[in-house]
């Protein structure tokens, strides 16, 4: 229950940040956006329709069509995110900051949007619209969520050329790129993963200490030295970046002659890391 309350809080805060990106930075500078929000802005520039109301109607329609591609939790979280975002778009409409620097506003629009959407996606929700398409692409095509979202968003952005012009469209693309990078940071965090390969005569002692002291699993692989022709068992360990110094200390204490390779890892799914179903 506590985790769900924290998740809902993250959804609401994320929706607020995204609404600020639109009302504080995008609309005052005639910038576009991707997905449903981009369509909402086009309709606002053309007909002065309320972004909050339009956003809610369009996303509700897409949810009715695409909810079957989302699991139960994601659907509920998406409904909360869409409702909160539409509400905040309405409440913050007309807010402004005293800045006429288009480049600065573009950067901050990307940062706020990236933080907002990143928080929503991190807890398992979406902002509906193109985010639903990105989730589907991630689930069935194994596309990176952030870049799938960027792809679908760009389709709407290029369409906005006829409304906001070439210069503002290019600034919008910059905003989306910044948002994608910030979103990646929010979703992945600073917990860069490392995969460690260890070849040692004291492999059993190292593996036992990693299990006991670090509470990490160790996989034993079979290998063979080309020069010696001897068969060897190789340890393969996946850890968080901040655990690397402790692992090095364990290896040094067990075998100062151990051969160790440290690999950078982009994503790790499974027990002890990220649930692969998310």
Curated annotation (Swiss-Prot):
Bilayer-crossing regions: 8-28, 46-66, 77-97, 101-121, 145-165
Topology relative to the membrane: Multi-pass membrane protein
Source organism: Bacillus subtilis (strain 168)
One annotated Gene Ontology cellular component of this protein: plasma membrane
Family: Belongs to the UPF0750 family.
CDD domains xrefs: YitT_C (cd16380)
Compartment(s): Cell membrane
One protein family per Pfam: YitT_membrane
Gene designation per UniProt: yxkD
Main subcellular localisation: membrane
Name of the molecule in the record: UPF0750 membrane protein YxkD
Alphabetical keyword list: Cell membrane, Membrane, Transmembrane, Transmembrane helix
Domain of life: Bacteria
PANTHER family: UPF0750 MEMBRANE PROTEIN YITT-RELATED, UPF0750 MEMBRANE PROTEIN YXKD
């Amino acid at each position: 229950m506590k985790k769900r309350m924290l998740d809902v809080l993250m959804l609401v805060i994320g929706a607020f940040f995204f609404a600020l990106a639109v009302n504080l930075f995008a609309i005052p500078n005639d910038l576009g956006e991707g997905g449903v929000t981009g369509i909402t802005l086009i309709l606002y520039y053309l007909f002065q329709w309320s972004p909050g109301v339009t956003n809610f109607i369009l996303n509700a329609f897409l949810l009715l069509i695409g909810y079957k591609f989302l699991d139960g939790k994601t659907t509920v979280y998406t409904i909360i995110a869409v409702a909160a975002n539409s509400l905040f778009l309405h409440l913050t409409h007309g807010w402004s900051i005293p800045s006429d620097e288009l480049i600065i506003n573009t950067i901050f629009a990307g940062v706020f949007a990236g933080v907002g959407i990143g928080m929503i996606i991190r807890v398992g929700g979406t902002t509906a619209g193109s985010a639903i398409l990105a989730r589907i692409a991630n689930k069935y095509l194994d596309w990176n969520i952030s870049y799938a979202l960027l792809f679908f968003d760009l389709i709407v952005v290029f369409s906005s050329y006829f409304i906001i012009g070439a210069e503002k469209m290019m600034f919008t693309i910059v905003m989306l790129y910044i948002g994608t990078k910030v979103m990646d940071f929010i979703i992945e965090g600073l917990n860069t993963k490392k995969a460690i390969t260890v070849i040692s005569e004291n492999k059993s002692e190292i593996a036992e200490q990693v299990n006991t002291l670090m509470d990490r699993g160790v996989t034993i692989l079979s290998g063979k030295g080309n020069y010696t022709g001897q068969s060897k068992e190789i340890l393969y360990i996946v850890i968080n970046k901040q655990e690397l110094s402790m692992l090095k200390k364990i290896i040094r204490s067990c075998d100062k002659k151990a051969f160790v390779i440290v690999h950078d890892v982009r994503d790790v799914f499974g027990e002890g890391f990220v649930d692969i179903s998310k």
